[in-house]
Amino acid sequence: MDRKPIIYQLLPRLFTNTNNHCIPGGTYQQNGSGKMNDITDTVLSGIKELGATHVWYTGVIEHATKTDYSAEGITPDNPHVVKGQAGSPYAIKDYYDIDPDLAVDVKNRMRE
């Protein structure tokens, strides 16, 4: 590489969220979430056109949340350890899993 790397930090929860009327402190049901599937080749090409050489995905790792995915075997966390409703992407629960909010198909979230 002949030039310095330029890193584009991308928070999928916000970057690809199509809800234009998010409520501060709102729930997943109220605000929704961007999805990993929405980060397409076109999106990545657009980031590259900005001059970025790398993408740093933030908030992808499973973190504490109040969202209930019990049907998929993921129970909500104790509200005392969750920041707001959506949780902080820095409150990591499992370094080897993906945040289910970012998946279209929660059971297959690792493939997305």
Model-flagged regions — what are they?
Residues 1-112:
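Acidic/aromatic-lined carbohydrate-recognition and catalytic surfaces
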